[in-house]
Design a protein with these regions (language model features):
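Single-stranded RNA-binding regions, centering on S1/OB-family and related RNA-binding modules
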Residues: 552-556, 563-698
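Flexible glycine-/small-residue-rich
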Residues: 33, 42-44, 61-63, 113-117, ...
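Mobile "lid/hinge" segments at catalytic clefts and subdomain interfaces of large enzymes
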Residues: 140-257, 448-547
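Long, basic N-terminal domains or extensions that often function
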Residues: 1-232
Length: 698
């Protein structure tokens, strides 16, 4: 049965059609927001997947190029693998949805969002997230929703709900908040040093809007929602837990996980697991889920230690940061490098500078962002956690971590005019025991400064965790969580910023939301830790950006020419500019407004290229002294090349002060000589002279 529902959202109409399309999916919502159209579907397998100890949720965000009237590039002219932006959007949808599915549910679930039309006034990301929530809520898939998502921008200090793409381009804040009926469940932000109090206000402005959307979703579910289907629970039998505790008492498990060394803990758990496998050798059913049971036992033990005893696995106080270390210039010959270590987490970051033409080209649905000059990439090899796995390129997690660190530094980057470089920073994870993304922020800041990148202020990142009890008031916020506290805790609240404000937030949780009290405490705690990291660690390693780029980094000369002269500089089919490049070994980029960028490593060659371009792009003036190479000899004189494609004639009468019978008596092919421009003759031709060059000419 086809039904349509509508509400006003930020001055635009949001329409949800149910029962119109994709009727064979468990749930489908055909979403219209302005002229933005997204089809969101939710489907689940009939039976649980065997042999897994996690919920197999897959979220897809498909960018169809026809949505913006484009044909995809490439040989096949069809959409290929998901873009980086599509992957990041999928993660934003996944993070608030995942905690609301039952923890013992093992059926495969796919949430698919197909962007079919894009209205620049209405961001498809918001529509896709709302569509996923609605499709799941009205389906028969078990889900403890609804949840809603809102974006907040800020221009001139005023909050804007669901800003347009044009408003986002000039906004000081790009905030996305997802909420349940009472609590915040996901936060994602990029900001231009927004004060903590202002950020909290923005978060709860979004939360307020989300409550109206949730009422709208409730009305849809009331009319067309399906009863939730029963499912086969994959919960661990209580009898197994009781048997495990008989063999491994709580005190023994507590002793096993209480260590500041990750490998020691893992070895302790391995010994316990082997003992249990031996004890349950005759019970195949228990052996099949023993690994998950031991994991759950560890989790309960660690949570009790933290919440009841205020005792962290590595012995730190609740607000204590792990030992920190920072150093720069650890890799020779690269343009900039730094290493940041926090406990058993270690990141090496390397910066590479290149001309602006090397900026990444973006072929997506956002017509306001077609390229980016700053790229941060994050790698997580298996050796960083002591494992052996083949390297298959970056996965969604790596792309997400790289994007977070990138977003954290964008607000402090110099403008293109101040620093005309494309910048690539790569974070290599040497060791991992939690918070590698935040260590990447610290390392990339120092690496950029070491490379001579004049960032406005240093940026640091820190993560807070959470362990909750039975009530909203029974909780503990942990500063600087390690891997174990991330796995067994309820929250990973990452905040990056400068001394003056927040530049990025990413909050993931495993429970059904956070109260305002927890959000405020976590943000306050991260500010305190961030100040310490900046002042006591990073600024002692490198206090300010280097004044010049490194020895091996390319240098750049910028100049302006008359746009009308661009054709002469380029030459027919690029002949002139390629001749300059071949001779000098530099890289030259010219924009339509006449801005020229000359990039190279040898200053003399860059200066020569600049001189050539100046000669080509300007008219000769009387009295101008030039150096030219003899490229052709005629009976009446010699032709000199002053720059590729720019020639002039020295008449035989101007070769020497005495009478010259033959041109070859004075010059030969290939000679390099100085000449002076004599101005134009009666025919309007520019003439040059060797004999009239002043004696003191340089």
């Amino acid at each position: 049965m086809y039904k349509s529902f509508s509400m006003e959202l930020a001055g635009r109409t949001l329409t949800v059609d149910v029962g119109r399309v994709a009727k064979q999916a468990n749930g489908a919502a055909f979403m219209h927001y302005g002229d933005t159209v997204v089809l969101s579907t939710a489907t689940a397998s009939e039976k649980p997947r065997d042999g897994i100890d996690f919920f197999p949720l897959s979220v897809e965000y498909e960018e169809k190029m026809y949505a913006v009237g484009k044909i995809p590039g490439g040989f096949n002219k069809r959409e290929g693998k998901a873009s980086e932006h599509a992957i990041l959007t999928s993660r934003v949808i996944d993070r608030p949805m995942r905690p609301l599915f039952p923890k013992d549910y093992r059926n495969d679930v796919t949430l698919n969002n197909m962007v079919m039309s894009v209205d620049p006034e209405c961001d498809p990301e918001v529509v896709a997230m709302l569509g996923s929530a609605i499709a799941t809520c009205i389906s028969d898939i078990p889900f403890d929703g609804p949840c809603a998502m809102t974006q907040i921008g800020m221009i001139d200090g005023e909050f804007i709900v669901n800003p347009t793409l044009a408003q986002k381009a000039v906004s000081d804040l790009k905030l996305t908040v997802a909420s349940t009926r009472e609590k915040v469940i996901m936060i994602e932000a990029g900001a231009k040093e927004i004060p903590e109090a202002k950020m909290i206000d923005a978060i709860y402005k979004a939360h307020e809007v989300n409550q109206e959307i949730i009422k709208f979703i409730d009305s849809i579910v009331a009319e067309v929602g399906k009863p939730k289907h029963a499912y086969e629970s994959c919960a661990i039998p209580e009898e197994l837990f009781a048997a495990i505790k008989e063999i491994v008492p709580p005190a023994e498990m507590e002793e096993a996980v209480f260590s500041d060394d990750k490998q020691t803990r893992e070895e302790n758990i391995r010994v316990i697991t082997e003992k249990l496998e031996e004890a349950f050798a005759d019970n195949e059913e228990w052996l099949a889920v023993l690994g998950e049971a031991v994991y759950q036992y560890q989790k309960k033990t660690v949570r009790k230690m933290i919440l009841k005893d205020h005792k962290r696995p590595d012995g730190r106080a609740i607000t204590e940061i792990r030992p920190l270390a920072a150093e720069v210039d650890i890799i020779p010959r690269v343009h900039g490098s730094a290493m940041f270590t926090r406990g058993q987490t270690q990141i090496c970051n390397v910066t590479t500078l290149a001309p602006l033409s090397e900026a990444q080209k973006l072929d997506g649905l956002d017509e306001f962002e077609t390229s980016k000059r700053y790229m941060h990439q994050y790698n997580f090899p298996s050796y960083s956690v002591g494992e052996t796995k083949p390297s298959r390129g970056p996965g969604r997690r790596e792309i997400g971590h790289g994007a977070l660190a990138e977003r954290a530094l964008v607000p402090v980057l110099p403008t293109e005019e101040e620093f005309p470089y494309a910048i690539r920073t790569v974070s290599e994870t040497f060791e991992s025991n939690g918070s590698t993304s935040q260590a990447s922020i610290c390392a990339s800041t120092m690496s950029l400064m070491a490379a001579g990148g004049p960032i406005k202020k240093p940026v640091a990142g820190i993560s807070c965790g959470l362990v909750t009890g039975e009530t909203d008031d029974d909780y503990l916020v942990l500063t600087d969580i390690q891997g174990l506290e991330d796995f067994f805790g309820d929250m990973d609240f990452k905040v990056a910023g400068t001394h003056d404000g927040i530049t990025a937030i990413q909050m993931d949780i495993k429970i059904h939301g956070l109260t305002r009290q927890i959000v405020e405490e976590a943000i306050a705690r991260t500010k305190q830790a961030r100040e310490y990291i900046l002042t006591e660690v990073m600024e002692k390693a490198i206090a300010e950006p280097r004044k010049t780029v490194g020895e091996f980094a390319p240098k750049i000369i910028q100049m302006m020419i008359d746009p009308q002269k661009i054709g002469e500089v380029v030459g027919q089919r690029g002949k002139t500019i390629n001749a300059i490049i071949d001779e000098t070994g530099v890289k030259i980029d010219i924009t339509d407004d006449g801005a020229v960028s000359i990039c190279g490593t040898e200053q003399a060659m860059m200066d020569q290229a600049k001189k050539y371009i100046e000669i080509i792009a300007s008219d000769f003036t009387e009295g101008q002294i030039l150096t030219g190479k003899v490229v052709s000899i005629k009976d009446f004189g010699a032709f000199l090349e002053f720059a590729p494609g720019k020639e002039g004639l020295v008449h035989i009468s101007k070769l020497a002060k005495q009478r010259v019978e033959k041109v070859e008596d004075v010059v030969s092919l290939g000679d390099v000589v100085k000449v002076v421009c004599m101005g134009k003759d009666k025919m309007g031709r520019v003439s040059f002279s060797i004999k009239d060059v002043p004696a003191d000419a340089k």
